[in-house]
Amino acid sequence: MALEVLEALDSARTQWYHVTAIVIAGMGFFTDAYDLFCITTVSKLLGRLYYFDPSTGKPGKLPNNVNNLVTGVALVGTLSGQLFFGYLGDKLGRKKVYGVTLILMVACAICSGLSFGASAKSVMGTLCFFRFWLGFGIGGDYPLSATIMSEYANKRTRGAFIAAVFAMQGVGIIFAGLVSMCLSAGFKASYHAPSFHDDPIMSTQPQGDLMWRLVLMIGAVPAAMTYYWRMKMPETGRYTAIIEGNAKQAAADMARVLDIEIQAEQDKLAEFKAANDYPLWSNEFFTRHGRHLIGTMTSWFLLDIAFYSQNLTQKDIFPAMGLIDKDFEMNAIQEVFETSRAMFVIALFGTFPGYWFTVFFIEKLGRYKIQLIGFFMMSVFMFIIGVKYDYLRNENSHMFALLYGLTFFFANFGPNSTTFVLPAELFPTRVRSTCHALSAAAGKAGAMVGAFGIQNYTQKGEQKQIKHAMMILAVTNLIGFFCSFLVTETKGRSLEEISGEDGRESELTPTPPNNRVPTRQEPRSETM
């Protein structure tokens, strides 16, 4: 059984409102990526500015615990925000809490740049406080954007639309490198300084304190630009009909968006809801969806260990690849410029294409195949880097850069995209946002393993440590490959068919007997 409003959404041709939804939701992910990854470009500058000790004879460096907090605290906030807003998205509505996440992102991006204090410790403490709440807002964007896009899209292009929203993360990473590169180039040209080797004191320009603040605050701009349009979006038809039980409002909203006439079918909706009223934490849910939830959570957890380790430790690996000079050969702002430039190049030629390959091929190859291919290829390239690390570092840095870039490509033309898409499709409407939040939060738990574990291990930039880290990540990706067998293909099917909400039984989403949709000839069974 399918409601007319749901069939209309599934069969709708691609229209302008689909494009606007992608842009509005996608700009949130642009901001998310920019805010999460721009800290990588300026963290070494923070060390030079606030933690320089002349007695060491080396440029200032953030202590391990401070570095882990500055780069990783936003991930803790993101995990918390995913669970909080994901739950509210199912209880209050996707739209009602969608604007709150954006307000948090704008306010905390600005406040991060205004971090204050009389000592280095207090400045870093204030920065960490605001970046936690920045991450909290970012976290809410994950389940809400994915759920909204999946519920707006038609079944033929749903995967491509959700992937396109997520692909804006790649644009955000590029801009994190580009903005830092442009600002540091301007400051470098305006405020000349010797290298650390020539003058340890004068090599750190005091104007760098303004520069890192500008880098962080610029993240507020794209989010602020989309707030009005985000508030103008109607609630999704699936939420209004299936969760609120208001078939008339759902039909009216979607008829206006699709520019067609849709019947309300309130009586049919009552039967639909009665067949799907089991709670999230129930035996019935785990019978029907437990395997998929375990699959989406474990694969995202393992993927983010590798993905965030790569992104957050780039600044430590770039010197080993020969992409930037040694720190004592540069002044503070020059180091930001070279780190940002290397990050921009890797993102432009490795990260960015992978996202859009997924957009273009997800409806042809399917989510499942792309995820398996991505995990496997990441494991292969990281294993090669780990085994041949000494040769690549000392004799063939260009091949090192190519292999490293390919790991980013197959992360994004692979599990980094599909782990975002699949939880938005596999689960029933009334728990879709929560299940996506649980999967995404598992991912951020993996990101924290990368940020606090792998990053801490590689921070000194020693060859042996980076080599071992690559081997660990290769094994992590291989485990992710096998965990991917717990999920299933969703392309070309309606959300209700995938989740079993329409009453049809499938091999992968069994419908327990007491939850069959009652016909007019038989009495309805008691619902558990």
UniProtKB/Swiss-Prot annotation:
Q: Which InterPro entries match?
A: MFS_dom (IPR020846), MFS_sugar_transport-like (IPR005828), MFS_trans_sf (IPR036259), Phos_permease (IPR004738)
What's the name of the protein?
Low affinity inorganic phosphate transporter 4
Comp. bias intervals (Basic and acidic residues): 496-507, 519-528
Which family is this protein grouped under? Belongs to the major facilitator superfamily. Phosphate:H(+) symporter (TC 2.A.1.9) family.
The lineage's top-level taxon is Eukaryota
Q: Which residues form the signal peptide?
A: none
Localization per record = Cell membrane
Q: Which organism is it from?
A: Lotus japonicus (Lotus corniculatus var. japonicus)
Q: Which residues lie on this side of the membrane: Cytoplasmic?
A: 1-18, 90-96, 144-158, 230-292, 363-371, 423-433, 489-528
Q: In which tissues is it expressed?
A: Expressed only in mycorrhizal roots, exclusively in cortical cells containing arbuscules, upon arbuscular mycorrhizal (AM) symbiosis with AM fungi (e.g. Gigaspora margarita and Funnelliformis mosseae). Also observed in root tips of non-mycorrhizal roots, in a phosphate (Pi) depended-manner, highest expression levels being observed in low Pi conditions.
Q: Which PANTHER family does this one have?
A: SOLUTE CARRIER FAMILY 22 MEMBER
Protein's gene: PT4
**Keywords of this entry:** Cell membrane, Glycoprotein, Membrane, Phosphate transport, Symport, Transmembrane, Transmembrane helix, Transport
Q: Other comments?
A: Although related to the sugar transporter family, it does not transport sugars.
**Broad class of the protein's primary localization:** membrane
Pfam families linked:
Sugar_tr (PF00083)
Q: What does this protein do?
A: Low-affinity transporter for external inorganic phosphate (Pi) probably involved in the acquisition of phosphate released by arbuscular mycorrhizal (AM) fungi (e.g. Gigaspora margarita and Funnelliformis mosseae) during AM symbiosis; required for propper mycorrhizal arbuscule morphology. Acts as a Pi-sensing machinery at the root tip level, independently of AM fungi, involved in the regulation of early root branching and lateral roots formation.
